[in-house]
């Protein structure tokens, strides 16, 4: 079984913020695959299904970003999922908006949700779908920036990014992370928002 985790913060206040990018993609994946994420427990909203012949568990931790690992660890332990079968979908300040990068293992880039997951799972070997959100002009503004909503120009292209990220996840499930990396890691989806 694969555990696919979308990162974000619960509650209406954070619903449309950049930090909830992972939630957006997971919601799209669940809708397209007819997987109801209505189960509660393990500090998450979650649901089980089958994609490309493989059992999958989709989950959105409800712990707030900085404690995401608590939920991921509970799910992985209960369903006996090894760290290499965990795929985390998250926003990434180090990538421009419109860029998606797939990655297996590696550093956390200062992302507090990833740090929490790495600490909770005992290592960084989980897979990631990194969703670029760009950076604010001033480094000191990062905390505010990730909790702001997307701009109007970003919103125009957001659906395309979400659908592309969903397709990348499907390829990870069906063909493996390396094949999906070859397909998606050179892609840039920002032709409509050069002004951002």
Swiss-Prot record:
Keywords: Cytoplasm, Hydrolase, RNA-binding, tRNA-binding. It is found in: Cytoplasm. Its main location: cytoplasm. It catalyses: an N-acyl-L-alpha-aminoacyl-tRNA + H2O = an N-acyl-L-amino acid + a tRNA + H(+). InterPro entries: Pept_tRNA_hydro, Pept_tRNA_hydro_CS, Pept_tRNA_hydro_sf. One of its GO terms (cellular component) is cytoplasm. Hydrolyzes ribosome-free peptidyl-tRNAs (with 1 or more amino acids incorporated), which drop off the ribosome during protein synthesis, or as a result of ribosome stalling. Catalyzes the release of premature peptidyl moieties from peptidyl-tRNA molecules trapped in stalled 50S ribosomal subunits, and thus maintains levels of free tRNAs and 50S ribosomes. This is Peptidyl-tRNA hydrolase.
């Amino acid at each position: 079984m694969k555990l696919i985790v979308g990162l974000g913060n619960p509650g209406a206040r954070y619903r449309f913020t950049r930090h909830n990018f992972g939630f957006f993609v997971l919601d799209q994946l669940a809708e397209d695959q007819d997987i109801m994420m209505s189960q509660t427990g393990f500090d998450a909203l979650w649901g089980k299904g089958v994609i490309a012949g493989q059992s999958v568990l989709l989950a959105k931790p409800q712990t707030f970003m900085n404690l995401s690992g608590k939920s991921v660890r509970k799910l992985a332990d209960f369903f006996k999922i090894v760290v290499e079968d965990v795929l985390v979908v998250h926003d990434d300040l180090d990538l421009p908006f419109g860029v998606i990068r797939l990655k297996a293992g590696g550093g956390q880039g200062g992302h507090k949700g990833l740090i929490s997951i790495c600490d909770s799972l005992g290592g960084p070997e989980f897979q990631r779908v990194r969703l670029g959100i760009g950076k604010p002009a001033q480094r000191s503004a990062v905390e505010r920036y990730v909790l702001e909503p997307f701009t109007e120009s970003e919103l125009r292209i957001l659906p395309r990014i979400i659908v592309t990220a969903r397709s990348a996840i499907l390829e990870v499930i069906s063909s493996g992370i390396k094949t999906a990396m070859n397909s998606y890691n050179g892609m840039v989806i920002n032709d409509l928002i050069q002004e951002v």
